[in-house]
Regions:
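Conserved pre-ATP/AMP-binding loop-to-beta segment of ANL
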Residues: 5-8, 118-120, 134-155, 162, ...
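Conserved AMP-binding/adenylate-forming core of the ANL superfamily
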Residues: 9-53, 57-61, 78-83, 87, ...
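Conserved AMP-binding A3 loop
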Residues: 18-22, 144, 151-175
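AMP-binding/adenylate-forming catalytic core of the ANL superfamily
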Residues: 77, 94-96, 233, 241, ...
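ANL superfamily adenylate-forming
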Residues: 99-147, 254-255
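Conserved AMP-binding/adenylation subdomain of ANL enzymes
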Residues: 174-191, 199-240, 254
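Gly/Ser/Thr-rich phosphate-binding loop
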Residues: 213, 238-243, 254-314, 322-325, ...
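Conserved ATP/PPi-binding loop(s) of AMP-dependent carboxylate-activating enzymes
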Residues: 319-323, 334-364, 402
Length: 461
């Protein structure tokens, strides 16, 4: 903020609104006055219920600057458990976006409810941003927190069971932001683009925290749009864009007339949040000529491994990030050698989350010696991580461990197949039998025999 106050920190394409580092500095100091007046201190929680917006990221940064704890919840994905989540967080302040149907939840919350409102650089701000205008924009209030105090709480979808919050300390958050900026290779003047929710860890690290600590610019959209995605990358001279495998599939299944030549500023797109099949990867690069990289991590372990764009090794996740120690263990907990397959452990002490915020409001500490990812994989001779499946998804057929992802990757090589999914079902003799489902491209319908023969050509009987 002091060295580049006029540089843009975040711009939202839907709002057509930008927030500079200088304006963020002023807003953060005003927000610090707002929180201090209400007596908030370290580990007191500010709950943010909002969609992607300039205001969202302004509050995120401002809360961390003051030293309180910011709790984020994806309203739509956690709708069934929202009241329980709010009760577990026990926020001192609830900042909410109007128009999301949150009235009942807000009424049941213990903390002070304040509409988020709109920030306008030229005046006429509303909600919170009108409320904080009476406070000084100068840096007169010191942070109330230390590095080991809680900085961020975020939630998973909660579609299977009651969701748990994941707690990062202020130090943990910073180390993740710094490691992410390092592997992305971004700094002042660089622009990244994201359209994923900032209620999720991945977007928080990659396109909020990494630009914040490096002085880069985040260009955001509220949602993904297949027809507008490449236009955004072109219009805003994006250097690095963030995708997930679903976006890659959508851009493959319904191609857009664009190529790398149309995007001269774009260095690469990086995919995360789920494994990217090698076939998807090669097909995307072949179709568009745009480099794809991949990264992996977890809510508990933070960003863990990633390619540095051009040094990508297709079919792998990439090497460990600078604060991470990644290793693989067998069923007895013994470390395995390079090339040997087992469960992947992320032992990034400085990037590892503190613990879980449980549904009853209690805190469950995470082990300090590493996070069991639940992923199966190995590390190759170049130090690149490979993920081959999930421990819980393993199909055990007649005593043989079969990774569904291995079968999926073969199925999608068939020219008629768009997507594939493999599961295990009970079998009276083998214990489990393999069953696979495929979604075919429009107008194509290969026979069962054809698909079985295709699999036999690449898989053992």
């Amino acid at each position: 903020a002091r060295t580049q106050p006029e540089n843009v920190f975040v711009h939202c394409v839907d709002q057509d609104k930008s927030l500079t580092y200088g304006a963020l500095y002023a807003l953060s100091n005003r927000f610090a006055g707002f929180l201090k007046e209400r007596g908030l201190g370290a580990n007191d929680r500010v709950l943010l219920l909002a969609e992607n917006s300039v205001e969202n990221l302004a509050v995120f940064a401002a809360t961390l600057r003051y030293g309180a704890t910011l709790a984020t919840v994806h309203v739509e994905m956690n709708q069934a458990h929202l009241a329980e989540i709010v009760a577990a967080i026990a926020p001192r302040i609830v900042l909410y976006q109007e128009g999301l149907g949150l009235e009942e939840v807000i009424e049941g919350a213990e903390g002070e409810a304040v509409p988020l409102g709109d920030w306008n650089a030229d005046g006429g701000s509303t909600g919170l941003f009108a409320e904080i205008e009476k406070f000084s924009e100068e840096d007169t209030i010191e942070s109330c927190a230390g590095p080991d105090d809680f900085g961020v709480i975020f939630y998973t979808s909660g579609t299977v069971a009651k969701p748990k919050g994941v707690i990062q300390t202020h130090a943990t958050a910073w180390y993740n932001y710094d490691a992410t900026a390092d592997y992305l290779g971004i700094g002042p003047g660089d622009r990244v683009f994201d359209c994923r929710s900032y209620s999720w860890l991945s977007a928080q690290h990659m396109s909020f925290g990494a630009p914040l600590v490096s002085g880069a610019t985040c260009i955001m959209a509220k949602h993904f749009s297949r027809s507008r995605y490449f236009g955004w990358l072109k219009d805003y001279d994006i250097n690095v864009g963030f995708v997930v495998p679903t976006i890659v599939n959508m851009l493959l299944n319904q191609p857009v007339p664009v190529s790398a030549r149309d995007l001269p500023h774009l260095r690469f797109l990086t995919s995360s949040s789920a494994p990217l099949l090698e076939e998807q990867w090669r097909a995307f690069e072949g179709l568009y000529g745009i480099k794809l990289a991949q990264s992996a991590g977890s809510s508990e372990g933070g960003n863990s491994a990633a390619h540095r764009g051009a040094d990508r090794k297709i079919g792998t996740i990439g090497p460990a990030l600078k604060y991470q120690d990644i290793f693989v263990i067998d069923g007895e907990g013994n470390r395995l050698k390079q090339g040997e397959t087992g469960e992947i452990i992320f032992a990034g002490g400085r990037q590892q989350a503190y613990g879980y915020l449980m549904p009853d409001g209690s805190i469950e500490r995470l082990p300090v010696d590493g996070h069991h990812s639940g992923d199966i994989g190995f590390i190759d001779a170049d130090g690149h991580l490979h993920i081959t499946g999930r421990v819980k998804e393993l199909i055990i057929r007649g005593g043989m461990n079969i990774a569904p992802l291995e079968i999926d990757s073969v199925l999608v090589r068939h020219p008629a197949v768009a997507e594939a999914g493999t599961i295990g079902v009970p079998h009276p003799i083998y214990g489990e039998e393999v069953v696979a489902y495929v979604a075919c491209l429009d107008g194509l319908s290969p026979s069962t025999a054809e698909m079985l023969n295709h699999c036999r050509s690449a898989l053992p009987e």
